[in-house]
Amino acid sequence: MSSSDISVVVCVYTEDRWEDILAAVSSVRAQSLPALETLLVVDHNATLLERLTREYKETDAVRVLANAGPRGLSAGRNTGIAASRGEIIAFLDDDAVAERDWLRHFAAGYADPRVMAVGGRTMPIWASGRRPAWFPEEFDWVVGCTYKGLPPGRVRVRNVLGGNASFRRTAFDAAGGFATGIGRDGDKRPLGCEETELCIRLTRAEPDAILLIDDRAVIHHRVPEARERFGYFRTRAYAEGLSKALVARSVGSGKGLESERRYATRVLPAGVARGLRDALLARPGGAGRAAAIVTGVLTAAGGYVLGSVRARRGGATFSVVEIEGVPDDEGAAA
């Protein structure tokens, strides 16, 4: 696969991440397999849109455009997909940097024409310099990173993780775009699962489709100090439960919770056992990790129950949009 086949979409929303955004773009421009283009999609922030347009107006292959849909990450990604030119569309978080061979490893996965998506491994960069002793690796998804329990290597999966992922353009032709109403909206309650819902929808539309995670496609994701705290851990776990309820409503609880059942019955009990063992051996954080796993499970379950009730009552909605080309509106007001 040539460099001309890959577009990279980075969705941004706040000037507070200015240096992170510049670092993310620089990491894409330094790839051993160059991207066709990098698209910065600004989520309804006119000041940031104007500033980024000035920053990159002389830079080849970096395009800045406004989110053409409702506020939120899903609509921003859909805007990037519609405006992109590559046959493969990769997504990178705005507070992450990609290793040099990130796109090369993505591209290798598409040698098989049945492969419709390839994700990678996301490693945390803790603001404090180290992982909090109580924070279990099994819950690294709380901070947008690859969690303990995912299989190593290049493996087939139910869904990729959105901040470090790529899709064939034809995947969106078959399944539509990311569902709005599920994912994040700036700094509001940290919902997620929009990529899970999309991937399940994709494999239903294309039963022969293969989705992969290749752990050699590595990005490093910054975890701010506020997200190292137990309060955020609980909030994010609760929001995950709310999101999973929406996914189950869309695709059914069987497929929607298939991976989560394995995770809850195999990975998490082993994590609790390790934490308790470490506590007995007087190793730092063991009891805290075991308690955090139990708390995370119960909190997510509570969110799922409430989300399911809301969904049945019609209090939670989302929609799937078809991806259509959008006009080139670089520098337009958000």
Model-found features: residue ranges?
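Glycine-rich, basic loop-to-helix element that forms the pyrophosphate-binding segment
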Residues: 67-84
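A short, conserved alpha-helix in the catalytic core of glycosyltransferases
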Residues: 162-167, 171-175, 182-217
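N-proximal low-complexity "stem/linker" segments adjacent to membrane-targeting elements
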Residues: 1-27
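Non-catalytic, C-terminal membrane-associated alpha-helical segments of glycosyltransferases
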Residues: 235-239, 253-334
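Conserved donor NDP-sugar-binding/catalytic core segment of glycosyltransferases
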Residues: 101-134
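Short, flexible, basic/aromatic active-site loop/helix in glycosyltransferases
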Residues: 136-157
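Short aromatic/hydrophobic "clamp" motif used to bind/position activated sugar donors
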Residues: 89
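Acidic donor-binding segment of Leloir-type glycosyltransferases
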Residues: 25-66
